[in-house]
């Protein structure tokens, strides 16, 4: 795609114009594309800024609109709105994956559909708009594009999909087997509690409890993700599954 057409398509998709076109170019450049290319900028620093701008805009919006909600309630709603899965939903709505510059290897392994890559691009795009047009325009852009997610968060209709996140991370290095095993359940039928463990490559990586099997599996996946991070087994190259 020619560069002029690229910018026009992206601006049309986002319904916004950029004064500095290079900002959106950088926002849509994955680090894998820049490897070995001297002087090519990629979007990781912009992700950092975009994350902060998004948090501020959503915080201000919730604070002004929902005056009766407590600090704890507002914090919980914000975390749902700005979580990776919500950003992924926005990215899919834009179909932004097709515009991302990435290495052939990243593309072959499903990079254009990867939750983390798409979510990071949304943050980088927000940063690009903020740098190019300032806070007021960025806030309006965020509210316009996140309004459905904000509404779902207020209605408690957002579920954090930790299982998908765990699967994407551990399978970066190949088709590594993940298994969720129901350990036991207890309590009456109307208030039954389920206990689940998750195994990655036959290693127990996390456990979770919930009032449905699905909830207990999500909590087990969340526990596994926390352990992978804290034990430094999770990194950009994948996960060490050889430990016993």
Swiss-Prot record:
Pfam families the UniProt entry points to? dsrm, Ribonucleas_3_3
| Organism domain of life | Bacteria
Query: Any idea where the DRBM domain is?
Result: 161-230
Question: What molecular function terms (GO) are annotated for this protein?
Answer: double-stranded RNA binding; metal ion binding; ribonuclease III activity; rRNA binding
Query: What cofactor requirement does the entry state?
Result: Mg(2+)
Sorted alphabetically, the Gene Ontology BP terms of this entry are: mRNA processing; regulation of gene expression; rRNA processing; tRNA processing
**Key words of the record:** Cytoplasm, Endonuclease, Hydrolase, Magnesium, Metal-binding, mRNA processing, Nuclease, RNA-binding, rRNA processing, rRNA-binding, tRNA processing
Residues forming the catalytic site: 51, 123
What's in the GO CC field? Answer: cytoplasm
The protein's enzyme class = hydrolase
The EC code for this enzyme is 3.1.26.3
* InterPro entries reported in the protein's UniProt record: dsRBD_dom, RNase_III, RNase_III_dom, RNase_III_sf
Q: Where is the signal peptide?
A: none
Q: Where in the cell is it found?
A: Cytoplasm
UniProt: Mg(2+) binding residues: 47, 120, 123
Ranges where the RNase III domain occurs: 7-134
What this protein catalyses is: Endonucleolytic cleavage to 5'-phosphomonoester
Its chief place of residence is: cytoplasm
Q: How would you summarize the oligomeric state and partners of this protein?
A: Homodimer.
Its biological purpose:
Digests double-stranded RNA. Involved in the processing of primary rRNA transcript to yield the immediate precursors to the large and small rRNAs (23S and 16S). Processes some mRNAs, and tRNAs when they are encoded in the rRNA operon. Processes pre-crRNA and tracrRNA of type II CRISPR loci if present in the organism.
Which family does this protein fall into?
A: Belongs to the ribonuclease III family.
- Put simply, this protein is called Ribonuclease 3
Q: Which organism is it from?
A: Clostridium kluyveri (strain ATCC 8527 / DSM 555 / NBRC 12016 / NCIMB 10680 / K1)
């Amino acid at each position: 795609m020619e560069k002029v057409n690229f910018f026009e398509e992206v601006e049309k998709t986002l319904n916004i114009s950029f004064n500095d076109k290079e900002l959106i170019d950088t926002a849509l450049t994955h680090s894998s594309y820049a490897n070995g290319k001297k002087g090519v900028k990629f979007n990781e620093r912009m992700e950092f800024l975009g994350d902060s701008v998004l948090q501020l805009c959503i915080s201000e919006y919730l604070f002004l609109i929902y005056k009766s909600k407590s600090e704890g309630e507002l914090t919980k709603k914000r975390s749902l709105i700005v979580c990776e899965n919500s950003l992924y939903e926005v990215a899919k709505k834009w179909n932004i994956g097709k515009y991302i510059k990435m290495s052939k290897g990243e593309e072959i392994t499903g990079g254009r559909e990867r939750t983390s890559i798409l979510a990071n691009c949304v943050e980088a795009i927000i940063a690009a708009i903020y740098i190019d047009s300032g806070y007021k325009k960025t806030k309006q852009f965020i509210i316009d594009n996140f309004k459905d997610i904000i509404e779902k968060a207020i209605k408690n209709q957002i579920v954090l999909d930790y299982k998908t996140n765990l699967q994407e991370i551990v399978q970066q290095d190949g088709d590594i087997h993940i298994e969720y095993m129901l350990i036991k359940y207890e309590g009456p039928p109307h208030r039954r509690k389920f206990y689940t463990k998750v195994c990655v490559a036959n290693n127990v990586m996390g456990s979770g409890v919930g009032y449905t099997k699905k909830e207990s599996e999500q909590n087990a996946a969340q526990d596994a993700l926390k352990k992978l991070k804290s034990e430094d087994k999770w990194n950009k190259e994948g996960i060490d599954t050889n430990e016993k």
